[in-house]
Swiss-Prot record:
Task performed by this protein: Catalyzes the reversible cleavage of pseudouridine 5'-phosphate (PsiMP) to ribose 5-phosphate and uracil. Functions biologically in the cleavage direction, as part of a pseudouridine degradation pathway.
Key word Manganese present: yes
Protein's name according to its UniProt entry: Pseudouridine-5'-phosphate glycosidase
Keywords: Glycosidase, Hydrolase, Lyase, Manganese, Metal-binding
Entry GO CC: cytoplasm
Recorded catalytic activity of this chain's protein: D-ribose 5-phosphate + uracil = psi-UMP + H2O
Required co-factors: Mn(2+)
SUPFAM superfamilies, sorted: Indigoidine synthase A-like (SSF110581)
Any GO MF annotation of the entry: hydrolase activity, acting on glycosyl bonds
A GO BP annotation: nucleobase catabolic process
EC numbers for this chain: 4.2.1.70
Annotated family: Belongs to the pseudouridine-5'-phosphate glycosidase family.
Length: 310
């Protein structure tokens, strides 16, 4: 641990020293989610939303072999403009660091980094999951196994709608991951506020979610929680409208032989084209919405710990 090339930004280091709430943020949305300069603008906006609520943002990335917990302004800008950045999960983060590489962290790698840094809450857009056709391709995101073993509460707008949501929920149940939807009974569908799937659990406020996180820690249970936060109805694309668009994108990916890590970026880009940019607008709205909730959960965790005298 002493030799680990890990560095906190000045802002994150100060927040840790003062016991202030911190929320981890992933970096693949910057490098693989949207073009420059929009990616930089959105990253700054999400960070500023957290700061406005009294929470410190910790955007996580690997740069020149060092794992950064929080990026300085110039580092964020450099990452936003970088080309050919690796997309890191549990499988390849160590190799990237060992070879002095640069990479953006997915959900699984961000969870690992957050836990190493003592950060309990992480906000993202949507988690990865079981891809459609996984019964033959075995394409299942490492995010699901990470949720089962790393004790970080992840706030997302559900699983990405391009996935097989039913199978994703089944795997999460098998792995013992609590799936908590906020404020409604149905599991959200990323760009759409609701889906046909009932959420395993429901909670209506960040205080309860924070208490559940702490209870898992106290019980000695491994793994984190998935907090499914529906996109606001004013920002959503209804599921009935999206279904045929997703089907078209899936068919195009199959026709062009897109496989592995290339599948998700291809589908997101194709859906962006087919929705004439509305999917990206919704994505930005849901990421900001998730960050705000994550901030409230982080604040509740700190408050609960103070009350308990921990």
């Amino acid at each position: 641990m002493t030799n680990l090339p890990l560095r906190h930004s000045a802002e994150v280091a100060a927040a840790k020293a003062a016991g202030r709430p911190i929320v981890a943020l992933e970096s693949t949305i910057i490098t693989h989610g949207m073009p420059y300069p929009q990616n930089l603008e959105v990253a700054r906006q999400v960070e500023d939303d957290l700061r406005a609520a009294g929470v410190t943002p910790a955007t996580i990335a690997v740069m020149d072999g060092t794992l950064h917990i929080g990026l300085e302004a110039h580092q964020l800008e450099a990452l936003a403009q970088a080309k050919g950045v690796a997309k890191l999960s549990r499988a390849d983060i160590a190799a990237c660091m060992a070879t002095g590489g640069t990479g953006a962290t997915t959900v699984s790698a961000t969870m690992i980094a957050a836990h190493l840094a003592g950060i309990s809450v992480f906000a993202t857009g949507g988690i990865g999951g079981v891809h459609r056709g996984a019964e033959s391709s075995f394409d299942v995101s490492a995010d699901l196994l990470e949720l089962a073993q790393t004790p970080v509460t992840v706030v997302a707008a559900g699983a990405k709608a391009i996935l097989d949501v039913a199978k994703t929920l089944e795997v999460l149940e098998t792995q013992g991951v609590p799936v908590i939807t906020v404020g409604q009974d149905s599991f959200p569908a990323f760009w759409s506020a609701e889906s046909v799937f009932k959420s395993p659990l429901r909670m209506d406020d960040p205080v309860g979610i924070a208490a559940a996180h702490q209870m898992r820690v106290d019980l000695g249970l491994p793994g984190g929680q998935l907090v499914a936060n529906p996109i606001p109805h004013t920002d959503e694309i209804p599921a009935t409208e999206l279904a045929p668009i997703i089907a078209t994108a899936q068919a195009d990916a199959e026709k062009h032989g897109i496989k592995g890590k290339a599948v998700t970026p291809y589908l997101l880009q194709r859906i962006y084209e087919l929705t004439q940019g509305r999917s990206l607008t919704a994505n930005i709205a849901l990421v900001r919405n998730n960050a705000r909730l994550a901030g409230a959960i982080a604040q509740a965790l700190i408050a609960n710990a103070r009350i308990a005298g921990k």
